[in-house]
């Protein structure tokens, strides 16, 4: 049961899905799309970035805020990256393989391509692009999908280059890895047609399914990201970036609605109190010279403790806006853009070693009343000043309403401030890449793959898989291998579709949970295992042990693994003698249990011959011997 009536609240939401394409080369150079270990980096360099003007002479507001603090961006390069990633060489021609894949995606969403595609530069000065911009090209529009809550329009599809991956932050320096920079991706943006958290997940799932249906997108953590645009009536549009887990989307929408509602409640109370923000910044360093608070002592060593007074904000700065996050957290997020660690506010004091006496002395010194709140920042003088100014601005916004902003998704479904929403000044033409003609003939030549949902239905109807198994294999990364093996063993009595599917989406995950490095398993390994079963060299019960062994030692052949495990085929006479001897030894038990003795005795036989002989054959031989013993008795 949902907490809110989202229709009544006027919820509007849309998604932007960013999916890496599995092309051989990057978008504007011929480097491979390989993800490398940071330890493999063979050189590094650094950059300082600043906001530049658009063709209209304007600077993007998001870029301006991000460059207030001078940061050093360090880039790790590899023998699989080149001067294009370093921004030391102009980009090459746009990757035609990536363009073909993107047009195929556009077809699946019933979109209309542009007649002529132009590459643009999108200003990005967070260090994730060495050039200070991301190359992007608008490719198609006017698509749609059908959902349980009606049609959801697909507004646009763009082809973009992936950003560099952030490795870590050290002080004012940020380290990025260039292996990911330039990998082709598609950005799919929906219209604000999403009506509820569950609807958001449904739309995201469907778009993800369509993308995977191409068989030409990368898989794994970080290869697909969802941005969510959300607003409610009387609220504001907020873009939440970097939702990597599908399971988080519903929580993100719910908690953003909750945040905006709580901010509206706080605004109403501020208006009723006739609250306002004083712009004067006070130097409170001298008040805390003898403080016992270690955090304030560190601030004094850095240079300054600055404070600001928020008239009639007392009690509201500590008001919760999301689970575990308060209005004060919103203030702190803004302050952090100046490079400080956070803020102190009187709604949470005394605390952190700061005494009640020190808080009162601060109130007296700056003329704060009991119903006022005070904000403090302890850091270098310039950082502290910028941080306090950012908090003052955010406090004013709390009175005015909800600010439009870009926020980042947190692991618990909450969000934190990143930067203002970018404006039109963010985009300008890329003059180093020629435009590309998209003719109707070219678009018509792009083949459209079968959707995974349709493929699952086909597997169930044509291959005899149950619905659950058909869906699992259709959505699995092993889909191409499954189809190849299915074709090879279409008329084989020992290897059928169910055995192949259960191996790939049942046994493989199980041995992975048990610690096996299943990424070591190749198509050749699986082909060899099923060939051995087909030739009756091993029984299907041996699959788990055999794959575990191959995952541990991927360099050995299937035949070597069979030999190492002692799984070579047994002489039928040897099996028959074992069963006869066991039946004689267990004669009293068989007389007592009769035919019901089959189950317990089968366990003994399987322990001896598991993986070496098909269980059905063993069961048949044992039953025959038990029946013979009972009849003779």
UniProtKB/Swiss-Prot annotation:
Broad class of enzyme this protein falls into: ligase
SUPFAM superfamilies in the cross-refs: GAD domain-like, GatB/YqeY motif, Glutamine synthetase/guanido kinase
Gene Ontology molecular-function annotations: aminoacyl-tRNA ligase activity; ATP binding; glutaminyl-tRNA synthase (glutamine-hydrolyzing) activity
Gene Ontology CC terms: cytoplasm
Enzyme Commission number(s) of this protein: 6.3.5.-
Pfam family, one: GatB_N
Catalytic activity, as annotated: L-glutamyl-tRNA(Gln) + L-glutamine + ATP + H2O = L-glutaminyl-tRNA(Gln) + L-glutamate + ADP + phosphate + H(+)
Domain of life (superkingdom): Archaea
GO biological process, any: translation
Keywords associated with the record: ATP-binding, Ligase, Nucleotide-binding, Protein biosynthesis
PROSITE patterns registered for this protein in UniProt: GATB
InterPro entries reported in the protein's UniProt record: Asn/Gln-tRNA_amidoTrfase_suB/E, Asn/Gln-tRNA_Trfase_suB/E_cat, Asn/Gln_amidotransferase, Asn/Gln_tRNA_amidoTrase-B-like, GAD-like_sf, GAD_dom, GatB_C_1, GatB_Yqey_C_2
Subunit structure: Heterodimer of GatD and GatE.
PANTHER family reported for this sequence: GLUTAMYL-TRNA GLN AMIDOTRANSFERASE SUBUNIT B MITOCHONDRIAL AND PROKARYOTIC PET112-RELATED (PTHR11659), GLUTAMYL-TRNA(GLN) AMIDOTRANSFERASE SUBUNIT E (PTHR11659:SF2)
The protein's role, per its UniProt record: Allows the formation of correctly charged Gln-tRNA(Gln) through the transamidation of misacylated Glu-tRNA(Gln) in organisms which lack glutaminyl-tRNA synthetase. The reaction takes place in the presence of glutamine and ATP through an activated gamma-phospho-Glu-tRNA(Gln). The GatDE system is specific for glutamate and does not act on aspartate.
Similarity-based family: Belongs to the GatB/GatE family. GatE subfamily.
Protein name listed in UniProt: Glutamyl-tRNA(Gln) amidotransferase subunit E
Species name: Methanosarcina mazei (strain ATCC BAA-159 / DSM 3647 / Goe1 / Go1 / JCM 11833 / OCM 88) (Methanosarcina frisia)
């Amino acid at each position: 049961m949902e907490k809110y009536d989202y229709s009544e609240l006027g919820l509007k939401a849309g998604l932007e899905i960013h999916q890496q394409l599995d092309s051989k080369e990057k978008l504007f150079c011929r480097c491979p799309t390989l993800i490398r270990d940071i330890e493999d980096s063979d050189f590094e360099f650094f950059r300082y970035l600043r906001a530049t003007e658009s063709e209209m002479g304007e600077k993007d507001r998001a870029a301006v805020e991000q460059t207030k603090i001078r940061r050093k961006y360090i880039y790790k390069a590899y023998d699989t990256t080149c001067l294009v990633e370093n921004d030391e060489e102009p980009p090459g021609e746009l990757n035609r393989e990536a363009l073909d894949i993107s047009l195929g995606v556009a077809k699946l969403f019933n979109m209309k391509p542009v007649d002529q595609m132009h590459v643009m530069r999108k200003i990005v000065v967070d260090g994730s692009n060495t050039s200070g911009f991301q190359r992007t090209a608008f490719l198609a529009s006017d698509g749609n999908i059908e959902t349980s809550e009606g049609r959801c329009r697909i507004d646009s599809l763009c082809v973009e280059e992936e950003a560099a991956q952030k490795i870590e932050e050290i002080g004012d320096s940020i380290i990025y890895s260039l292996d990911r920079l330039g990998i082709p991706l598609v950005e799919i943006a929906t219209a604000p047609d999403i009506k509820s958290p569950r609807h958001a997940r449904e739309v995201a799932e469907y778009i993800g399914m369509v993308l995977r249906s191409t068989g030409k997108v990368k898989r794994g953590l970080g290869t697909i990201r969802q941005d969510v645009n959300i607003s409610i009536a009387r609220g504001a549009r907020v873009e939440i970036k970097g939702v990597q887990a599908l399971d988080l989307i519903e929580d993100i929408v719910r908690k953003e609605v909750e945040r905006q509602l709580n901010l509206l409640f706080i605004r109403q109370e501020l208006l009723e109190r006739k609250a306002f923000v004083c712009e004067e910044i006070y130097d409170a360093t001298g008040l805390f010279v003898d403080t016992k608070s270690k955090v304030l002592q560190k601030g004094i060593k850095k240079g300054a403790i600055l404070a600001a007074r928020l008239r009639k904000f007392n009690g509201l700065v500590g008001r919760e806006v999301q689970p575990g996050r308060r209005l004060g957290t919103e203030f702190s997020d803004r302050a952090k853009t100046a490079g400080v660690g956070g803020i102190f506010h009187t709604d949470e004091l005394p605390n952190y070693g700061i005494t009640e006496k020190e808080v009162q002395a601060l109130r007296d010194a700056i003329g704060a009343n009991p119903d006022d709140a005070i904000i403090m920042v302890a850091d270098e003088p310039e950082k502290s000043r910028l941080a306090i100014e950012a908090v003052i601005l955010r406090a004013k916004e709390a009175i005015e309403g909800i600010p439009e902003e870009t926020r980042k998704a947190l692991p618990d479904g909450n969000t934190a401030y990143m930067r203002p929403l970018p404006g039109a000044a963010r985009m300008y033409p890329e003059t180093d890449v020629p435009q590309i003609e998209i003719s109707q003939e070219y678009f018509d030549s792009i083949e459209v793959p079968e959707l995974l949902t349709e493929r699952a239905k086909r597997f169930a109807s044509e291959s005899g898989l149950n619905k659950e198994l058909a869906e699992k294999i259709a959505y699995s990364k092993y889909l191409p291998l499954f189809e190849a093996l299915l074709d090879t063993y279409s008329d084989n009595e020992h290897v059928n579709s169910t055995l192949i599917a259960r191996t790939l989406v049942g046994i493989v995950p199980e041995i992975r949970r048990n610690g096996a490095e299943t990424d070591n398993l190749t198509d050749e390994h699986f082909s060899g295992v099923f060939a051995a079963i087909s030739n009756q060299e091993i029984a299907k019960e041996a699959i788990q042990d055999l794959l575990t062994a191959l995952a541990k030692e991927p360099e050995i052949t299937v035949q070597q693994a069979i030999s190492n495990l002692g799984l070579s085929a047994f002489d039928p006479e040897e099996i028959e003698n074992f069963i006869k001897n066991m039946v004689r030894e267990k004669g009293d038990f068989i007389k007592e249990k009769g035919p019901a003795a089959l189950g317990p005795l089968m366990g003994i036989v399987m322990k001896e011959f598991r993986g070496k002989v098909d269980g059905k054959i063993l069961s048949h031989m044992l039953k025959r011997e038990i029946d013979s013993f009972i009849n003779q008795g």
